Structure formats: structure tokens, C-alpha cells
């Protein structure tokens, strides 16, 4: 009997409470960066019934209307009705942002290397904290992402499209998806075993209507027919009712969907969240750099699967470690790939910021439906412009 394995990933919609918080935090970051690209920002958000709290630390010359940014973000998501228990115009907004700690700022503004006499401009900025970050790529999908998280994101995005277009008028903003994919003995995806979708809805909508619409207009529109069969299981709103949702149903907090934001659990995660953080925070920028490296390694044909780990010390520019794990799929030794990566990519925080142009207000668009593998928006860490350089670097190392 051939060995078959199941792997499951989930996603959540832009109307999920934790994702509302992420989007508000990144909307604030973008608003600040639009006026002050040199700003340091760590903006956290908590949402619950009728209330939004924004707190954290910033260093900036910009002035922004946080109240307006919060309300506009909530309205764009779709919380515009008082009956939702959380609406853009009636919600209470409570900002509490303070100046960044001077002890942290001194290590970011002047890295250890700079204090030791390194005059290179890209050695001037130190990592905003210690930590480890992972990036991943695999040849399962055109965007080089694991199939379970790719499908999960597409399902909740499709729900949002149908809601906003009015094609399914009873949908409300909160939703979740989960996809279980079956893999063969060679770790190739062969079918979708289970799909779970929970979507908030108006009280008048019936379970039969919701089930039919979700299967026909969402699942079958997203998942290729080759992956679906008579044994594929669909669980649509399995509790039987999902009228109360969003922050009225559950509180939400920035940074609580880090697996949804990345690879759906298919790859390791260093633990640091992204939203609300400027690019001097390596939790965010180095995770993007690691994805950039992994994706270009796979696209170059050097590997079929790659996980890249980067690690940093606070106030130090150079990473303390760079590791490439290819799970036995590399055409050359992993040590060669690591040396090539160090040749091609400048992994100091300032190097990453320059390489990926990260001082721009580009972050709010990443705060729902994943930071990695996006095909609907142009993200610099998703570009395949280092393929040739990596191939040449491998040759020089060998």
C-alpha cells in the first residue's frame, strides 16, 4: 500500500478580528512612512465590541490623524453597519503611542559595526532586536508556495470578492478557511481531502443556501477540479450559525495570525509578527529577505524546496547566522548555497531595506491574505530577479 499523508493549513478573511488589528497597525505604519520614510514604528492594535485601542512606540516627524486612519480601514474592510456590533463611524478609538526607547534606538541608529569603526553606510543601522526568521519556497504552485495555504488564502479572498461585489448579498466580513491536502509517497499533492469554511452571514440566510453558494461559487471556483473527488469532504459553517462575528464575537490583536501570514505551518517560524513594524525590525524585513532568497533558489532550479533561516543580535548589522535547508533536493551542497546567498544578498538591515525598497508605504496591502506568495499585488520579495546571480555565484563557489 502506498503511503499517503495529509497536511492542513488555514487562512482568515480581512474581517477576522485579528486581521482587522493587523490592517489597522499597517495602515498607521503606511500613513507615517508616507510622510516620514525614516520613521521607526511599532504599532499594536486591539479590537473588541465597539472599541479600538492603538498602542506602541514610534519615533517620527510625521503627524497623522490616527482616528481617521482607523475608521477608514474599518470601513474598507466592510464594517459599516451598527448591527455588526463594530462599525467604522460608531467605534471608539483610543490611541496611546509613545516615543521609542532611547536604549533601543541607539543600537538601531548606530550599529555595533559602526561604533567599531566600519564606515560602510549599510553597516550604520543595527537590527532592531535579536531573533530568528525563516523564509520558504517550494515548487507546488506557480507562486512557489505550499498548496494548502495557497488554496486557503484564495478561498477567503473569493468570499470577500463575492461579498463586496454584492453577488452574495448576505455575507458579512468575518470568515475562515481550512484546506487539507493529500500527498503521495513522493510528497506531491494529489487531491484535496477536506475543505472547511466558516463565513459570517445575515440572520435570514439559510444553511442550505450558504452551503450551496459556498461550494459552487467559492470552492469550485478556486480549487482545480482535478483536486476534488467524490471523497472530498466539505464542512460549511459546521456550527450551524455564524451571525455574530468580527470583534463582537471575539477580540482581536495584532500579530496573532503569524502562521496564516507565512506558510500555513508548512515551514518553521521564528515567532515574530510583522504588522505595525517598520523595516528596521528584522522580524519583518529579514522574513521578507528569507522568502526572497528561498524563492529565487527554487526558481533557479538549484532546489525544489528551500527553507532559509536568518538570525540577528540587537544593535548588530550582520546576521549571526545564515542557514539553507533544502530537504535533500539541492543539486549542490547546502554549504555552497549558503556561500552563494551571502555573495548575492546583503543581509544587513540597511542592505535588506535598500534591496527591497522597504521605506515605502506598502504594508497595509500585506496585512490580509498572506505576506508571501501574493500574485495580486507587486511585492519586491516575490520578484525573481536574483536567479541568474545565484546560478553564477554557485559556479564561483564551486
From Swiss-Prot:
K(+) binds at residue 44. The keyword Transport does not apply. It comes from the Bacteria. Its EC number is 2.5.1.6. Pfam families: S-AdoMet_synt_C, S-AdoMet_synt_M, S-AdoMet_synt_N. It is found in: Cytoplasm. Mg(2+) binds at residue 18. One of its GO terms (molecular function) is ATP binding. ATP binds at residues 16, 174-176, 241-242, 250, 256-257, 273, 277. Its cofactor is Mg(2+); K(+). One of its GO terms (cellular component) is cytoplasm. Its main location: cytoplasm. Binds 2 divalent ions per subunit. Binds 1 potassium ion per subunit. GO terms for biological process: one-carbon metabolic process; S-adenosylmethionine biosynthetic process. It catalyses: L-methionine + ATP + H2O = S-adenosyl-L-methionine + phosphate + diphosphate. Pathway: Amino-acid biosynthesis; S-adenosyl-L-methionine biosynthesis; S-adenosyl-L-methionine from L-methionine: step 1/1. L-methionine binds at residues 57, 100, 250, 281. Residues 100-110 are annotated as: Flexible loop. InterPro entries: ADOMET_SYNTHASE_CS (IPR022631), S-AdoMet_synt_C (IPR022630), S-AdoMet_synt_central (IPR022629), S-AdoMet_synt_N (IPR022628), S-AdoMet_synthetase (IPR002133), S-AdoMet_synthetase_sfam (IPR022636). Keywords: ATP-binding, Cytoplasm, Magnesium, Metal-binding, Nucleotide-binding, One-carbon metabolism, Potassium, Transferase. Catalyzes the formation of S-adenosylmethionine (AdoMet) from methionine and ATP. The overall synthetic reaction is composed of two sequential steps, AdoMet formation and the subsequent tripolyphosphate hydrolysis which occurs prior to release of AdoMet from the enzyme. Belongs to the AdoMet synthase family. Homotetramer; dimer of dimers. This is S-adenosylmethionine synthase.
